[in-house]
Each structure stands twice: as C-alpha cells, then as structure tokens.
Amino acid sequence: MEKLILGLDPGLAVLGFGLIKCIYNSKTEKIDSTSLVDFGVIKTTKKQEMGQRLVTIYEDLHTILNNFKPDLAATEKLFFYRMGNTILVAQARGILILALAQNEIPLIEFTPAQIKQAVTGYGNADKYDVQQAVARELNLEEIPKPDDAADALAVALTASWLN
C-alpha cells in the first residue's frame, strides 16, 4: 500500500511543506520504503496586507493539494510562546486546516518533542540534529533548505512512523 504524507510547518511569512511517499507492507503494515516527493516553502511579505497574505497561503497550499493529492497531512501542535508570533502562526494554521478540510485530507498533530523523539530518538534534540536525521532517513546528500521545509519533512516522517 502506498501513502503520500504531507508535513506542514505553519508560519505567516514562511510556511514549510514536505511530501513523502511511504510504501507499506500489506501483511505487516510496516514501512518497506520511504522516499522524498517534494518540499519547499510558501512565502508572504510584510508589505502585503494581512488578507492578501492569507490568500497567498491558501491558494499556494490548494495548488499543492491538487497537484499531489496527499492521503494524510501532519503539523506541529501550536504552543503559546510569544503572543504576537503565536497569533500570526495561528492565522496561517487556520488557513491550512481549512484547505485540508475542503479537500477531505485528515490532519494529525504532534508536539515538538514527539517529532524530535521520532526523528532523532531524543526528545530534546536540536534543530541541526533533526535536519541531519531527515537527510539521512530520506537518503539526501544535503540537509533540505530552507529550515521550514526540513521541519515539514520531519513532521511528515513522524506521521509515517506514528500514525
């Protein structure tokens, strides 16, 4: 069985996405192979009005969903850490939840510690350790750039293992 998993790292200025394909053994339901399909970012600028920034995120994400038709999406749970930044991330997150719901794509969420633990084996791993693990798991010669895309791939890998 084949499954396309979309990992998302929400942000208003930069929203990272990473898409992986997992092939599961039909008898054991364990993963036989995982491969990179695509990754990148959706960017907006402070010069754009808020509504236009959200429209950009929605339209670009909608294009990704239509082009790839993922079976599952995953993202990091939103935690309150800085009021202004949390509100901006929450707005972008609302747009991605809407786009996924409209396309009937299930969404699962993980804490940062769950993602770090799944990808590196250590819940307090730093960003570089996570990025190296992503490159290793997907047989990439280099760490995916930018960081937001690498983070999204870490979320997708976590979903493939924990879902």
UniProtKB/Swiss-Prot annotation:
Q: What class of enzyme is it?
A: hydrolase
Q: Which GO terms describe its cellular component?
A: cytoplasm; Holliday junction resolvase complex
Molecular functions (GO terms)? crossover junction DNA endonuclease activity; DNA binding; magnesium ion binding
Q: So where does Mg(2+) 2 get bound?
A: 76
| EC number(s) on file | 3.1.21.10
Binding residues for Mg(2+) 1: 9, 148
Residues at the active site: 9, 76, 148
Reaction(s) catalysed by this chain, per the record, are: Endonucleolytic cleavage at a junction such as a reciprocal single-stranded crossover between two homologous DNA duplexes (Holliday junction)
Q: Which domain of life is it from?
A: Bacteria
Q: Which GO terms describe its biological process?
A: DNA recombination; DNA repair
Task: State the needed cofactors, names only.
Answer: Mg(2+)
Q: Is Secreted there in the keyword field?
A: no
UniProt-listed InterPro entries: RNaseH-like_sf (IPR012337), RNaseH_sf (IPR036397), X-over_junc_endoDNase_RuvC (IPR002176)
Q: Where in the cell is it found?
A: Cytoplasm
Show the Pfam families listed in the entry.
RuvC
UniProt keywords, alphabetically: Cytoplasm, DNA damage, DNA recombination, DNA repair, DNA-binding, Endonuclease, Hydrolase, Magnesium, Metal-binding, Nuclease
Q: Does the keyword Iron apply?
A: no
Cofactor binding comment, as recorded: Binds 2 Mg(2+) ion per subunit.
SUPFAM superfamilies, per this entry? Ribonuclease H-like (SSF53098)
Assembly, per entry: Homodimer which binds Holliday junction (HJ) DNA. The HJ becomes 2-fold symmetrical on binding to RuvC with unstacked arms; it has a different conformation from HJ DNA in complex with RuvA. In the full resolvosome a probable DNA-RuvA(4)-RuvB(12)-RuvC(2) complex forms which resolves the HJ.
Q: What role is this protein assigned?
A: The RuvA-RuvB-RuvC complex processes Holliday junction (HJ) DNA during genetic recombination and DNA repair. Endonuclease that resolves HJ intermediates. Cleaves cruciform DNA by making single-stranded nicks across the HJ at symmetrical positions within the homologous arms, yielding a 5'-phosphate and a 3'-hydroxyl group; requires a central core of homology in the junction. The consensus cleavage sequence is 5'-(A/T)TT(C/G)-3'. Cleavage occurs on the 3'-side of the TT dinucleotide at the point of strand exchange.
- Entry similarity comment: Belongs to the RuvC family.
List the protein's name: Crossover junction endodeoxyribonuclease RuvC
In which organism is this protein found? Trichodesmium erythraeum (strain IMS101)
